[in-house]
From Swiss-Prot:
GO cellular component terms, A-Z: chloroplast; mitochondrial small ribosomal subunit
GO BP field: translation
Primary location group: plastid
Protein name: Small ribosomal subunit protein uS2c
PROSITE patterns according to UniProt: RIBOSOMAL_S2_1, RIBOSOMAL_S2_2
Keyword Ribonucleoprotein found: yes
Subcellular location: Plastid, Chloroplast
Amino acid sequence: MTRRYWNINLEEMMEAGVHFGHGTRKWNPRMAPYISAKRKGIHIINLTRTARFLSEACDLVFDAARRGKRFLIVGTKNKVVDLVASAAIRARCHYVNKKWLGGMSTNWSTTETRLHKFRDLRAEQKAGRLNHLPKRDAAMLKRQLSHLETYLGGIKYMTGLPDIVIIVDQQEEYTALRECVTLGIPTICLIDTNCDPDLADISIPANDDAIASIRLVLNKLVSAICEGRSSYIRNH
């Protein structure tokens, strides 16, 4: 894997509050190696470890993007919905930002069927055919389309399982993470002090509650993906 410089600096991370963990009572002992101190009842994350693993994750996604691999970003907490969508769109990745439907990846054939249905309905609507149906039928299909757009809108162009999945919150997206583990899909995961660092392939210790912290981590990963994509396009 290529090692590159990703301009990850500790001061910027401190300003974004990346180092603030959860209360000391609410922690996972497996996170001990990633914690540097306790302050006012809160665990403080060791930012040199964060920088190291974030840099490793950037190297991984850069190499994967350079080889034309597919990415999926998962983050469904209300506060990260827009952030996840904009990061994914910028890096031309697929994303899930509303709700992870159980079996979305482990039962891929069902997801694929839903995606075909979604694409067909979108095509029908764009062509104006839904307006020629009886009102009741049209209303039912429009409701169906709206539901599919909500839950599958971010993966509408997905034609197969992703090569790498980036998960914004381990606790919130546990089902998605377990499905990736089951299928052997490599994962990159933000982990706060109440998480299990052993579940993902690359765990990035960071505050997963503060928007500024999540934005910083996602921005670094997205920049690395974009650089890798540019390299892929130049060589093909």
